[in-house]
Amino acid sequence: MPQISRSALVPFSVEQMYTLVNDVDAYPQFLPGCTGSRILENSDTSMTAAVDVSKAGISKTFTTKNTLISNKRIDMQLVDGPFRKLTGGWDFIELSPEACKVQLSLDFEFTNKLIELAFGKIFKELAGSMVQAFTLRAKEVYSA
């Protein structure tokens, strides 16, 4: 089963990075390939959200239920989308009050080979660039 794991050391606090990753409504403003996002349910400890991605004329929507551990972790579980399985999450590890390590880990499997052929490479590129996109977003938002 394909896996993606990316991390970055950033000069921003765990609170700042957690807030950015949890701000699903802002994703289309800065995430490559993200054309829309919606929060379907939200509480202090969980969120269900849908994200629309499009690249090279291929568009897909996937929905995840996210378990929120404030300023530490966001666990993701597939609700709906072109996957048989999608699990993973974000970890925020404090290095100092002004710096942290951000890590994204995803395990996924598409519903069938046709979808994997059409969308697999695109999804891997998009998911692989997410940590960098959030790092650049943090510089825009917090270094102003």
Tell me what each language-model feature is.
Residues 1-44, 144:
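Hydrophobic ligand-binding cavity/cleft-lining segments
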Residues 2, 43-45, 58-60, 84, ...:
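Residue-level preference for beta-strand/loop junctions
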Residues 6-8, 38, 62-67, 87-94, ...:
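Hydrophobic/aromatic beta-strand elements that line small-molecule binding cavities or substrate pockets
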Residues 14, 40-45, 67-71, 91-101:
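A short, structured loop/turn motif at beta-sheet edges
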Residues 17-21, 27, 49, 66, ...:
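Hydrophobic pocket/interface hotspot
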Residues 38-79, 133, 137:
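Glycine-rich portal/gate segments that line the openings of hydrophobic small-molecule binding cavities
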Residues 78-128:
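Beta-strand/loop substructures that line and gate deep hydrophobic ligand-binding cavities in soluble
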Residues 136-144:
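Short, highly charged C-terminal tails/helix-capping segments
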